[in-house]
UniProtKB/Swiss-Prot annotation:
UniProt protein name: Wilms tumor protein homolog
PANTHER family, A to Z: KRUEPPEL-LIKE FACTOR 11 (PTHR23235:SF65), KRUEPPEL-LIKE TRANSCRIPTION FACTOR (PTHR23235)
GO biological process, one term: germ cell development
Biological role stated in the UniProt entry: Transcription factor that plays an important role in cellular development and cell survival. Recognizes and binds to the DNA sequence 5'-GCG(T/G)GGGCG-3'. Regulates the expression of numerous target genes. Plays an essential role for development of the urogenital system. It has a tumor suppressor as well as an oncogenic role in tumor formation. Function may be isoform-specific: isoforms lacking the KTS motif may act as transcription factors. Isoforms containing the KTS motif may bind mRNA and play a role in mRNA metabolism or splicing.
Species this chain originates from: Alligator mississippiensis
Lineage: Eukaryota, Metazoa, Chordata, Craniata, Vertebrata
Region described as Important for interaction with target DNA: spans on this chain: 206-220, 232-240
Site feature Important for interaction with target DNA, where: 263, 269
Motif (KTS motif): 247-249
A Gene Ontology term for the protein's cellular component: cytoplasm
Region described as Disordered: 1-21
Motif placement: 9aaTAD: 90-98
GO molecular function annotations of the record: DNA-binding transcription activator activity, RNA polymerase II-specific; DNA-binding transcription factor activity; double-stranded methylated DNA binding; hemi-methylated DNA-binding; RNA binding; RNA polymerase II cis-regulatory region sequence-specific DNA binding; sequence-specific DNA binding; transcription cis-regulatory region binding
TM annotation in the entry: none
Zinc finger (C2H2-type): 162-186, 192-216, 222-244, 253-277
Amino acid sequence: QGYSTVAFDGPPSYGHAPSHHAAQFSNHSFKHEDPIAQQTSLGDQQYSVPPPVYGCHTPTDSCTGSQALLLRTPYNSDNLYQMTSQLECMTWNQMNLGSTLKGHATGYENENHTAPMLYSCGAQYRIHTHGVFRGIQDVRRVPGVAPTIVRSASETNEKRPFMCAYPGCNKRYFKLSHLQMHSRKHTGEKPYQCDFKDCERRFSRSDQLKRHQRRHTGVKPFQCKTCQRKFSRSDHLKTHTRTHTGKTSEKPFSCRWPSCQKKFARSDELVRHHNMHQRNMTKLQLAL
């Protein structure tokens, strides 16, 4: 009771595999606590592609006693190991996987860590489960994105556990959905299309689509309490409100980029400015 079985089957087909990854599948089997086991039917509806494959490798000098988790999918075989190299050594202290190691001892136990860990064993597993792995399963749908999970009990207050693994971009986010939206800047994906007649514009975020559609409908939901003037965007209302307060020169949005002190009156101006920094950084990384 309270456990769901984790089964392993044959190896997937990959274009290549590094020598330190064993391609053998022994009769490994174990169970893990799945606090969201009752929601597996929801998971089945949410994920239409096969679960990702997880593997483990001998800990390197930089992560002795820890486990580097490899996220691999048959849909990303070309830059598979470039992507996994972005992953940090991690523990699963937030996911309550203490029982994962039952019947799967490997000799890498580390008493310095209070949180349960995944240990190196030289095997690859196809994990058939939802629940605690749901957040990581979402990642497989985002090309070039890897999750960063807190590595010890003392780091459970990590505010932004999901990090973009795109080369030259290390932005972190609190929610996986925010990381997914960000990743579309790199992939160019725009899944939201305007359905108004003769308009085929597409957007990477649903809120951008809603804002765009107000141009068609003329809806202006944001009203100034002082003069009753209406606006289609909340940031435009905030900028307008400063004309009543006498703070027209106020610039509350500051650039957080190192050694940059620029400030802006509107948040969208700050976003464009940050994007400029990011583009310059990416160009520099590629040049090196």
